[in-house]
Amino acid sequence: EKKKVFGLSFLSVFLWASAFPLTKVAQQQFTSIPLGFLRCTVAAIFLIIIGKCCHIRLPQKKHIPLFFVSGGLGFTGYMITFNTGILTLTSATSSIIIAVTPILTAIVASHLYKEKIKPIGWAAIAAAFIGVLILLLWEGVFSINIGLIWTVGAAIVFCGYNIMTRKLSAMGYNALEIVTYSMICGAILLGFWAGDGLHQLAGASVSHIIALIYLGALPSATAYFTWGKAMSYAERTSEVTNFMFVTPLLSTIMGFIILHEVPNAGTFIGGAIIIISIVVFNLKGK
């Protein structure tokens, strides 16, 4: 069981980490929001296939609006903000900002569900936000990279998705059902950009189409399935969630290998503060 948890968890974070540099590759021929539509559509198709094989249940009609809220936050809103943000960021910087999402989720959950956060947890949260400020202000107040603002927005909307996931889970839906129906709803909401997406798809090279299919099928579909499986085998949730800390490191390495990106000193300093804060928060803060 331990080996299964390790293997499935690592596979999930590896796939998620690869989405940062490969989104930048896909953006060489796709614009941000049409890319989001195509990625969500590919992911929805793959999740429907996985769901069929796993015999997932259909959602109740009265819950469909909740799936639209969930998909609107976690996939429509996330794709728009994430894809726009990463245009002007390195894979490393983007992945570090997104890594703050669990802390944002814990803050919201502490208010909604009255979950206690210890004083050391609040100290870790404060330190993480200092790390974000270092990233934002490293080049000076007047040269804040707008991509960072968009990516903080992506972390916030994904936090909203996490809270919705929890609500749907309490209603009896399992992880695969939640991500499948949320992804379908997210793709439908991105349908306004279907025309642009299909037009760009028709003119794209084979290598960029492969990058697009990879993004949809693996980080957006398979990784959620393997993450859910890892959770089901784990004795404690933290056995799985602690793997999230590896994502920025992996995406930095992949960004260097695939795109020859070299992060600036601000990314290393701010990033180190953020990652240490997240580790402390998860180990001691709750």
Q: For each of these PLM feature ranges, what is it?
A:
Residues 1-37, 140-167, 186-192, 254:
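Glycine-/small-residue-enriched transmembrane alpha-helix faces in small-molecule transporters
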Residues 15, 19-20, 51-98, 134, ...:
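Specific transmembrane alpha-helical segments of multi-pass solute transporters/efflux pumps
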Residues 29-77, 104-105, 127, 157-164, ...:
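Transmembrane alpha-helices of multi-pass small-molecule transport proteins
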Residues 38, 94-100, 165-186, 220-257:
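Helix-helix packing/entry segments at the starts of transmembrane helices
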Residues 46-55, 101-126, 247-268:
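C-terminal transmembrane-helix exit sites in multi-pass transporters
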Residues 47, 68, 117-137, 155-156, ...:
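Hydrophobic transmembrane alpha-helices of multi-pass small-molecule transport proteins
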